[in-house]
Design a protein with these regions (language model features):
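Juxtamembrane "stalk/linker" segments
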Residues: 1-37, 45
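Short, well-ordered turn and helix-capping elements at secondary-structure junctions
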Residues: 20, 39-41, 78, 150
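A generic local secondary-structure boundary/capping motif
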Residues: 22-25, 93-95, 134-135
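Structural motif
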Residues: 33, 71-72, 104, 143-145
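Soluble extracytoplasmic domains of inner/organellar membrane proteins
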Residues: 41-43, 49-132
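Extracytoplasmic/luminal low-complexity segments enriched in Pro/Gly and acidic/polar residues
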Residues: 113-161
Length: 161
């Protein structure tokens, strides 16, 4: 009976820890993928308007999630289900924090799926490198740390009558 109770407590503790990781409340470490996106040359200048108009960061995040990415940050801004990627003037905001190029995307996830993803041709990453004046660099990395969110989402609920 006591052993059963300890197992249930352990199971609940694991679920809580997993939830904290997914929500971005704790740092995560693991293997994954590093992606760097920048203008091909300095003459192009600020690419924020261009990147936002074409929803490039949003499309990359979605494709990464489908291909094994579990935890993602862009320029050290941790993403979770409440994160927003939006244009604000001449820069992009993530989690209401302005970020600038180059866009460094860190991904932790299934290393085999992520490796297969970057080795495939005709991925979205390939297309932005070919179709836009952007330089895309990718690298598989064994030791990646993605820090917890600096601003924890405060959920507010509307009270009913």
């Amino acid at each position: 009976e006591n052993l059963k109770s300890k197992n249930q407590d352990s199971k609940v503790a694991n679920q809580i820890n997993t939830l904290k990781e997914v929500l971005g409340y704790v740092d995560v470490k693991g293997s994954g993928l590093l992606i760097k996106i920048d203008a091909i040359n300095d003459e192009i200048g600020n690419i924020a308007n261009f990147v936002d108009y074409n929803k490039i960061l949003l499309n990359i995040v979605n494709e990464i999630k489908v291909n094994g990415g579990e935890y993602i940050s862009i320029n050290n801004q941790r993403l979770n289900q409440y994160s927003e990627i939006s244009l604000a003037g001449s820069h992009i905001n993530i989690n209401s924090t302005p970020i600038a190029q180059p866009y460094n995307i860190n991904v932790i996830g299934d290393i085999d799926e992520l490796t297969d993803y970057i080795n495939k041709k005709n991925t979205y990453l390939d297309s932005i490198g070919k179709n836009y004046q952007l330089k895309v660099e990718t690298k598989i990395e064994k030791n990646i740390t993605i820090e917890k969110m600096s601003i924890i989402n405060k959920l507010e609920y509307i009270e009913g009558e």
